[in-house]
Amino acid sequence: MKTYRRQIREKILQALYTLELRDTDIDSAAGWLLTPEILADPKAMKFFNLLLGNIKEHMEEIDRYIAAHTFNWDMSRIAIIDKNILRMAMAELLYCDDIPPKVSINEAIEIAKKFSSTDKSSKFVNGILDAIFNALKEEGKINKNGRGLIDHTPPRAAKTDAKS
C-alpha cells in the first residue's frame, strides 16, 4: 500500500507535539507513531527520516526565521501545533529540494485546518509561511530542483512594471 506524504507529515507533527509535552527525545516520540504501513515503505521512510532529520538539525535556524516574521508574537506564545506546523513547512521549504514551495505551504495549511484548535490557525500559518517564502525567494535561499522547481514568475514589482 502506498503511503502518502501527508500521513508522514502528520506523524512528524504529532512527534514534535509530543516532544514539547513530554520528557523524551524526538526519535523516541517519532518511533511510537510510525505505522507498519510507513515502516514497510522505503520511500515513506526516506521522506520521514529526511524531513525529521532536517527539523532536528536546523531547529534553531528555522525558529529564527519564524520569529523574524511573527512580529507581534513571541515564539512561546504561538500555539504548539501551529509552531510545529511552521517548523515542518520551513524544513521542507529550505531543505527538501524536490518539493515545490506551494506544495509545502498548502500541506501546512491543510494540516493546520485538521489539527489546530481554531479556524484562524490556517490563516496564521498561511500568512507567516507566505511572508517567509517571499523573503527567502528574494534572498535567493530557495534552492529547488527536479519536481521541486519553483515557478519562474517575475517578482511582484516586476509584474506591475510589465502592466504599465
UniProtKB/Swiss-Prot annotation:
User: Basic and acidic residues bias located where?
Assistant: 149-164
The segments labelled Disordered in the record are 144-164
Disulfide bond annotation, renumbered to this chain: none
| InterPro entries the UniProt entry points to | NusB-like_sf, NusB_fam, NusB_RsmB_TIM44
> Cellular component GO terms, alphabetically?
cytosol
User: What are the UniProt keywords, alphabetically?
Assistant: RNA-binding, Transcription, Transcription antitermination, Transcription regulation
What family classification does the UniProt entry report for this protein?
Answer: Belongs to the NusB family.
PANTHER family attached to this UniProt entry: ANTITERMINATION NUSB DOMAIN-CONTAINING PROTEIN, N UTILIZATION SUBSTANCE PROTEIN B-RELATED
Q: Which NCBIfam families match?
A: nusB
Quote the protein name from its UniProt record.
Transcription antitermination protein NusB
